[in-house]
Amino acid sequence: MFITMCVIAYNEENAIDRILGDIAAQDYNHNDMEVVLVDGASTDNTKKHLDNFKEKYKDDFRRVVVLDNPKRTLPSGWNVALREYKGDAIIKVDAHAEIPKDFVSKNVRVLESGEDICGGQRPVIIDEETPWKNTLLLAESSMFGSSIAHTGTIREKHM
């Protein structure tokens, strides 16, 4: 199964290398993966980190692409990613998350067993304890905030 890994980022220079490293370390065949990275017009060095990942791993994965999201918002970033992905399934991961090295392979097994949507636990890391960041952490720790994989007719329904 050809998998698209998607990360949407905005001003994540202090966290983005962690998830990019986790993507690079996946035990799933990299020739069956593409990585779609979307930068929301970051004002820090996030885009440079994404470009460095692309340059370093462009020959390791089937495809690595860095896209711009001038509207900056997360929903707009996902629209950019959804227009670009080529895989049979999309795996969404957050820019400030960590995933185990078997995250993709476990999700693929579930999808290949007949499920249309699956996900997995992954810790979300916050860089400082503030009421707002703790609220976001709580939301992202829920089922609806977690990383998910989807296969099916998303292109026809949501484009």
Language model features by range: what are they?
Residues 2-4, 34:
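Cell-envelope/extracellular polymer assembly enzymes that use nucleotide-activated donors
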Residues 21-32:
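Short, acidic, metal-binding catalytic loop of nucleotide-sugar glycosyltransferases
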Residues 22, 39-48, 71, 97:
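A conserved acidic beta->alpha catalytic loop
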Residues 32-41, 65-68:
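Short beta-strand/loop segment that forms part of the nucleotide-sugar
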Residues 69-85, 106:
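Glycine-rich, basic loop-to-helix element that forms the pyrophosphate-binding segment
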Residues 90:
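Short aromatic/hydrophobic "clamp" motif used to bind/position activated sugar donors
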Residues 101-134:
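Conserved donor NDP-sugar-binding/catalytic core segment of glycosyltransferases
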Residues 120-127, 136-159:
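Short, flexible, basic/aromatic active-site loop/helix in glycosyltransferases
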